[in-house]
């Protein structure tokens, strides 16, 4: 009886059929997770680059058109028109523009206001100041987006709100040039 059990146990342990299934089952989730994270990093990089480029172009327009006082909505529209991949930009972009006093420095808030996607209600701006000639201004844009693949390792590692939106923040500083009244 014991000999029969030993023989069957040796045959079972020596059998190599199906031996490729175990490594495949163990490695597949890791490889798929890495592939999804790679796609997520690419999408995040493209979104960040587009937001930063559009913000820089908008700031350049502000600096060149010294006689124009742009409103919050005009700047938001200019930034959103300068991007092609920021889905729902008008709804999930929030701007903050504050004056920076170089002589009496006060740190701006460390984190800009972002759109609250939980309620999708309009909340007042923390700060949006037009500024005057020779004044240093800080313009921050916060764009909220949903992850390309919520199952990826990167999407799970990024901070997000209750609705699953993640923030991309772009910052630009500029000096209001005086109007070009007559050289």
List PLM regions with ranges:
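Short, conserved structural patches
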Residues: 3, 56-183
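Alpha-helical assembly-interface signal, strongest on the long, hydrophobic N-terminal helix that forms
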Residues: 1-83
């Amino acid at each position: 009886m014991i000999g029969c059990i030993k023989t069957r146990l040796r045959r079972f342990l020596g059998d190599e059929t199906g031996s490729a299934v175990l490594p495949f089952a163990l490695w597949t989730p890791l490889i798929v997770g890495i592939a999804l994270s790679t796609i997520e990093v690419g999408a995040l990089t493209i979104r960040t680059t587009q937001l930063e480029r559009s913000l820089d172009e908008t700031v350049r327009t502000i600096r060149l058109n010294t006689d124009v006082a742009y409103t919050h909505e005009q700047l938001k529209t200019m930034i959103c028109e300068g991007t092609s991949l920021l889905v729902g930009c008008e709804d999930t972009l929030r701007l903050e523009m504050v004056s920076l006093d170089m002589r009496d420095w006060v740190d701006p808030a460390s984190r800009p206001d972002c759109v609250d996607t939980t309620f999708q209600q309009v909340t007042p701006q923390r700060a949006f100041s037009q500024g005057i000639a020779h004044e240093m201004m800080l313009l921050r844009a916060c764009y909220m987006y949903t992850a390309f693949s919520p199952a990826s390792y990167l999407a799970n590692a990024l901070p997000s709100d209750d609705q699953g939106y993640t923030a991309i923040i772009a910052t630009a500083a500029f000096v209001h040039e005086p109007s070009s009244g007559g050289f």
